[in-house]
């Protein structure tokens, strides 16, 4: 009698959990690729943990608080660690809708990954989209960064203008080269007009050219 009951239960489970069955999901794990030398062996204990995590996730869904580990069925387990699973409703003897299972897995994906030391790439639910990490908030607000950049640009521009003004003032103080030398040369030039040597007019000292003085002016004492 017990053998007949066991055979009946096994047959029902096989009918509910099979590849590509309604509401069934395929899972693929890459334990060796993720953990390397620290990889663990996938055995019945790991299967039990997986079923427990799925049952835990389902209990978070409204009206599914009574989900037990025995309600999660695994089938077609391979050595490369892939398998199919379904979640059953024992009262109605059928599998729960795929939408409910998918929602529960997505809400608790990080908890499931952490239980096996894996992530979305090494613990794949092939029909369930990967969860996206929340966007990272910058530690410094964007407006402060923009303000800092603009402030630096304005500071550099002001510094360049100040330096340019200082250089221009120095150039104006020095004056054009060669002006003073030309004036000195003009002071030493003596011109000759009508055979009479004439000293050029000294604009700086106010001297008068003796060549243009009359005889009375020369003899008149100062």
Curated annotation (Swiss-Prot):
PROSITE patterns (alphabetical): COLLECTRIN_LIKE
Cellular compartments per GO CC: brush border membrane; cytoplasm; plasma membrane
Residue(s) at site: Cleavage by BACE2: 125-126
Topological domain spans for side Extracellular: 15-141
Post-translational modification as stated in the protein's UniProt record: Glycosylated. Glycosylation is required for plasma membrane localization and for its cleavage by BACE2. Proteolytically processed in pancreatic beta cells by BACE2 leading to the generation and extracellular release of soluble CLTRN, and a corresponding cell-associated C-terminal fragment which is later cleaved by gamma-secretase. This shedding process inactivates CLTRN. Three cleavage sites have been identified for BACE2, two clustered sites after Phe-116 and Leu-118 and a more membrane proximal site at Phe-125; the preferred BACE2 cleavage site seems to be between Phe-125 and Leu-126, Phe-116 and Leu-118 act as alternative sites.
Domain notes: The cleavage site containing the double Phe-Phe motif acts as negative regulator of shedding by BACE2.
Alphabetized UniProt keyword annotations: Cell membrane, Glycoprotein, Membrane, Phosphoprotein, Signal, Transmembrane, Transmembrane helix
Regions crossing the membrane: 142-162
Lineage of origin: Eukaryota, Metazoa, Chordata, Craniata, Vertebrata
Name of the protein in question: Collectrin
UniProt gene name: Cltrn
Record localization: Cell membrane
Tissue note: Kidney; collecting ducts. Pancreas; beta cells of islets.
GO annotation (BP), single: insulin secretion involved in cellular response to glucose stimulus
Domain Collectrin-like intervals: 21-222
Description of how the protein assembles with itself and partners: Monomer. Homodimer; dimerization prevents CLTRN cleavage by BACE2. Interacts with SLC6A18; this interaction regulates the trafficking of SLC6A18 to the cell membrane and its amino acid transporter activity. Interacts with SLC6A19; this interaction regulates the trafficking of SLC6A19 to the cell membrane and its amino acid transporter activity. Interacts with SNAPIN.
Residues that carry a glycan: 76, 93
Superkingdom field: Eukaryota
């Amino acid at each position: 009698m017990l053998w007949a009951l066991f055979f009946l239960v096994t047959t029902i489970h096989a009918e509910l959990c099979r590849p590509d069955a309604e509401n069934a999901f395929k899972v693929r794990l890459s334990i060796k690729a993720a953990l390397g030398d620290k990889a663990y062996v996938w055995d019945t204990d790991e299967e039990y943990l997986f079923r427990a995590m799925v049952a835990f996730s389902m209990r978070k869904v409204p009206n599914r608080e009574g989900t037990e580990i025995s309600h999660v069925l695994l089938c077609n387990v391979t050595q490369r660690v892939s398998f199919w699973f379904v979640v059953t409703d024992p009262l109605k003897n059928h599998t729960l809708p795929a939408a409910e299972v998918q929602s529960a897995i997505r809400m608790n994906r990080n908890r499931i990954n952490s239980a096996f030391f894996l992530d979305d790439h090494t613990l794949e639910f092939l029909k369930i989209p990967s969860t996206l990490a929340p966007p990272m908030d910058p530690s410094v607000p964007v407006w402060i960064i923009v303000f800092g950049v603009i402030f630096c640009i304005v500071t550099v521009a002001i510094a360049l203008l100040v330096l340019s003004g200082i250089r221009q003032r120095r150039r104006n103080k020095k004056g054009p080269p060669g002006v003073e030398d030309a004036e000195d040369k003009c002071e030493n030039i003596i011109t000759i007009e009508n055979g009479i040597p004439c000293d050029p007019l000294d604009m700086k000292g106010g001297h008068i050219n003796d060549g243009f003085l009359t005889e009375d002016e020369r003899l008149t004492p100062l």
